[in-house]
């Protein structure tokens, strides 16, 4: 849930940056942003990769554990869950392509460079996406006692 929260905050922050700068909610009216602001494009991609649960990002560990647990219970549910993850990834990558690499070419200064506070917030989120994907045991070890006690309660009932 922590990883989901990090990714959701990152995506909402990115959406706010896009809408406040471009004054539109329509992805078809965006495009070509990567040409003007490569740092934003890279940070957006890192958050997106965490959201689609690519290995070595924060979303992967939770998705993997979830699907593994579901597979032991009902394999068809895990297959369905895996398909929804794939469809979500397709949607996210198509959105990124339209927004960052689309055919519209922005005028100089239309998507102004990121401010220091925006770089700090988005950079921190991107750092956490990678850190928690490369080193997930940090959170897993912290949560282990609570998980064990919860499993004992569930198995006792």
Predicted regions and their residues:
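Alpha-helical transmembrane segments and their membrane-interface exit regions
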Residues: 6-11, 147-151
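Divalent metal-coordination and catalytic microenvironments
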Residues: 4, 30, 59, 96, ...
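Short alpha-helical catalytic segment bearing the HExxH-like zincin motif
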Residues: 1
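Interfacial and helix-entry/exit segments of alpha-helical transmembrane bundles
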Residues: 7-88, 109-128
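Cytoplasmic/organellar membrane-interface segments at the starts of transmembrane helices
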Residues: 37-39, 92-157
């Amino acid at each position: 849930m922590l990883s989901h929260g990090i990714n959701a905050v990152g995506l909402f922050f990115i959406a706010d940056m896009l809408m406040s700068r471009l004054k539109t909610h329509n992805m078809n009216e965006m495009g070509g942003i990567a040409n003007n602001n490569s740092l934003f494009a890279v940070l957006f991609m890192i958050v997106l990769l965490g959201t689609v649960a690519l290995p070595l990002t924060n979303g992967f560990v939770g998705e993997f554990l979830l699907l593994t647990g579901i597979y032991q219970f009902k394999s068809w549910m895990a297959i369905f869950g895996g398909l929804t993850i794939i469809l979500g990834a397709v949607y996210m990558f198509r959105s990124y392509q339209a927004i960052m690499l689309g055919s519209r070419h922005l005028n100089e200064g239309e998507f102004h460079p990121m401010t220091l506070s925006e770089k700090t917030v988005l950079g921190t989120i991107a750092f956490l996406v990678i850190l928690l994907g490369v080193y997930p045991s940090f959170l897993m070890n912290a949560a282990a006692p609570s998980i064990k006690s919860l499993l004992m309660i569930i198995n006792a009932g």
